[in-house]
Amino acid sequence: MSRRCELTGKAVLTGHLVSHSNRKTKRRFLPNLCNVTLLSDTLGRSVRLRISANALRSVEHRGGLDAFLVKAGEQDLSQNARLLKREIEKKLAAAA
């Protein structure tokens, strides 16, 4: 399982740990990933995703998983999230 957010694409970054004497050693900045179950109102079912804490805040800010995915660009989404987005868009188009 990769250390990448399924909704925002946040991944591991690398950099330096700098000591007081300015000595640099390599380190990794890991994203704050959480395994969450979100409810899709359109599909009427729950979905398990591995997303960052920042993405979880963004989902709640936008008004739910469906609203987030409809506005999200496809380049940042994982394959699982892209399929979910297409399902939601089809269901919304059929309802309209």
UniProtKB/Swiss-Prot annotation:
Gene Ontology process terms (BP): translation
Which cellular component terms (GO) are annotated to the entry?
A: cytosolic large ribosomal subunit
Q: Which UniProt keywords apply?
A: Ribonucleoprotein, Ribosomal protein
Asked whether the UniProt record includes Disulfide bond among its keywords, one would answer: no
Checking InterPro entries in the record gives: Ribosomal_bL28 (IPR026569), Ribosomal_bL28/bL31-like_sf (IPR034704), Ribosomal_bL28_bact-type (IPR001383), Ribosomal_bL28_sf (IPR037147)
Source domain of life is Bacteria
Output one GO MF annotation: structural constituent of ribosome
Q: Which Pfam families is this protein grouped with?
A: Ribosomal_L28 (PF00830)
**Family per record:** Belongs to the bacterial ribosomal protein bL28 family.
What the entry lists under PANTHER family is as follows: 39S RIBOSOMAL PROTEIN L28, MITOCHONDRIAL, LARGE RIBOSOMAL SUBUNIT PROTEIN BL28M
| Protein's UniProt name | Large ribosomal subunit protein bL28
